[in-house]
Curated annotation (Swiss-Prot):
Name of the gene this protein is made from: Ttc39a
Pfam families in UniProt: Iml2-TPR_39
Organism superkingdom: Eukaryota
TPR repeats: 280-313, 470-503, 511-544
UniProtKB keywords: Repeat, TPR repeat
Species, as recorded: Mus musculus
Stated name of the protein: Tetratricopeptide repeat protein 39A
Database matches in InterPro entries: Iml2/TPR_39, TPR-like_helical_dom_sf, TPR_rpt
């Protein structure tokens, strides 16, 4: 590749000019290494002097801020990362060829004029596309229903189109590898992989909008690109690893069916955990993996270890507190779960409404003989929740909206208590897929749910009776499913649809009951029936709590069911042909 044009203007520690991309990338890898050994401030300080001149220093600085924002969900972190990413994007723009990649590159790639681009200009393209991609990711953090993501479609389209062109370039016979080729190719794999993976997960209604303007995603191709990027020894290798770990331990779990490729996650994590045994980020992922496997005590140890590993980045502790809160919920240790919800409500600003709601939810699980700490009263806490509503970039968090809606029944002078609010929120975060790995935990949860069911049956009829009964049946059905009591689970899920017209407030229960029944059928190989149920859940219900999250799960389940059907049909054809 030609080397004409300006170079990346950098300065070393003594103020001498550094002219090569190779040296810039080496310095950025050093900064990433500092970051991964919990030296967060040192990493940023190391990069900062060069962020106004070097696109890689600027992008790495912004990427570290974005990783912090994605780990903490803190509104200030999100704002800071977004502003820095904009600055990095402007700097990359200055280093790009004057005509944009999307305008001119598709014409050039088919002619022997690729050497019109310097190596630096090609790197500027991948860095520019990465800035756009990371800004889109920040938007998703703020707005789970993707409306803003679509509104910013031109930016996203430019990024997507650039990655597609760069992917074609990497595979072109006319491409000659520059000195920093592995870093460039790693950047392409990161972007192409991220786009394909993300687009493959989106609900159909959003996909239709995106595909209308040329977007499409292939999950398998996305995973392959990221896996290749993760093993490529490039500047972006660790970013590919982190994205894959997020996908395997969070996205497929919270926005999917909980059908996690845990072996792949462990394989990805192992070399990094060996290299950075005290690295907080990797200890955190180790905790997530243990939790997903149902090894709750081991998960607790990992999260505690993660907190002990560093004291500088306190907000990273908050992520561990959130996970520890759920670990103790799974174990039915309400006082410990309350302790972590209380810590979060005092120390973290992501969603005070959610944290106070969880405090109240855990207090409501205490027995009459239990000591209620600090004089807190669950009714007063529930009443405080609606007044704590927070907006990030003009949007309310879906979990917060859910907590506020549920708390409103406490605003009446003589409120009717929520039956099992902590266990309901546990469903929203797909926690039953965790306890389902351990029959003892599932049995314990079923016991709590059955007691709540008995209390509802003994109590007087009220305006919430149908809603509360259906909630209990949904959660009971999940426990029964994981205990192998399939017929009973199906009966509980079906009874929710049968009582659809009686439900007054918790309309989310109906599409979610259909989703859970579909997942139950899929486990029995009844994929055609499952697809019909999923289609009904998707098409027939609108404007209910956590709708976007449910649609993500429906999409994941539909893809899984169709894939199983296709595999079954292929097996049938093979056996017939034999």
């Amino acid at each position: 590749m030609g080397q004409k044009g300006h170079k990346d203007s950098l300065y070393d520690c003594k103020g001498s000019p550094v002219s090569s991309l190779h040296e810039a990338l080496d310095q950025c890898m050093t900064a990433l290494d500092l970051f991964l050994t919990n030296q967060f401030s040192e990493a940023l300080s190391y990069l900062k002097p060069r962020t106004k001149e070097s696109m890689y220093h600027s992008l790495t600085y912004a990427t570290i801020l974005e990783m912090q924002a994605m780990m903490t969900f803190d509104p200030q972190d999100i704002l800071l990362a977004g502003n820095m990413m904009k600055e990095a994007q402007s700097l990359c723009q200055r280093h790009r060829r004057k005509s944009s990649m999307t305008d001119s590159f598709s014409n050039l790639v088919h002619r022997p004029t690729i050497d019109q681009f310097t190596e630096e200009e090609i790197h500027a393209e991948v860095c520019y596309a990465e800035c756009l991609l990371q800004r889109a990711a920040l938007t998703f953090l703020q707005d789970e229903n993707m409306v803003s993501f679509i509104k910013g479609g031109i930016k996203v389209r430019n990024s997507y189109q650039t990655y597609k062109e760069l992917d074609s370039l990497v595979q072109s016979s006319q491409y000659s590898k520059g000195e920093s080729h592995r870093h460039f190719e790693g950047g392409v794999k990161l972007g192409v992989g991220a786009f394909n993976l993300t687009l493959s997960m989106l609900p159909t209604r959003i996909l239709r909008l995106l595909e209308f303007v040329g977007f499409s995603g292939n999950k398998d191709y996305g995973l392959l690109q990221l896996e290749e990027g993760a093993t490529g020894h490039s500047f972006r290798a660790v970013l590919c690893v982190m994205l894959l770990l997020c996908y395997h331990t969070f996205l497929t779990f919270v926005l999917g069916t909980g059908n996690v490729n845990i072996e792949e996650a462990e394989k990805l994590l192992k070399p990094y955990l060996n290299r950075y045994p005290k690295g907080a980020i990797f200890l955190f992922f180790a905790g997530r993996i243990e939790a997903i496997k149902g090894n709750i005590d081991a998960a607790v140890r990992r999260f505690e270890e993660c907190c002990e590993a560093q004291q500088h980045w306190k907000q990273f502790h908050h992520m561990c507190y959130w996970e520890l809160m759920w670990c103790f919920t799974y174990k039915g240790q309400w006082k410990m779960a309350y302790f972590y919800a209380d810590l979060l409500s005092k120390e973290n600003s992501w969603s005070k409404a959610t944290y106070i709601y969880m405090k109240a939810a855990y207090l409501s699980m205490f027995g009459k003989e239990d000591y209620k700490p600090f004089g807190d009263n669950e009714v007063e806490l529930f009443r405080a929740v609606p007044g704590l509503k927070l907006k990030i970039a003009g949007k309310s968090l879906p979990t917060e909206k859910f907590a506020i809606r549920k708390s409103r029944r406490y605003l009446s002078p003589n409120p009717i208590s929520l039956p099992i609010p902590a266990l309901e929120m546990m469903y929203i975060w797909n926690g039953y897929a965790v306890i389902g790995k351990q029959p003892t935990l599932t049995d314990g949860m079923l016991e709590v749910i059955t007691k709540a069911e008995e209390m509802l049956a003994m109590g007087p009829e009220n305006e919430y009776s149908a809603d509360d009964d259906c909630l209990v049946k949904l959660l009971k059905g999940l426990c029964l499913k994981y205990l192998g009591r399939i017929q009973e689970a199906e009966e509980n899920f079906r009874s929710i649809s049968a009582n659809e017209k009686k439900i007054k407030y918790d309309h989310y229960l109906i599409p979610n009951a259909l989703l859970e029944l579909a997942l139950l059928f899929m486990e029995q190989g009844r994929n055609e029936e499952a697809i019909k149920l999923l289609e009904s859940a998707k098409q027939n219900y609108k404007n209910y709590s956590m709708e976007s999250r449910t649609h993500f799960r429906i999409q994941a389940a539909t893809l899984q069911a169709r894939s199983s059907l296709e595999d079954g049909n292929r097996s049938l054809v093979s056996s017939v042909s034999l």
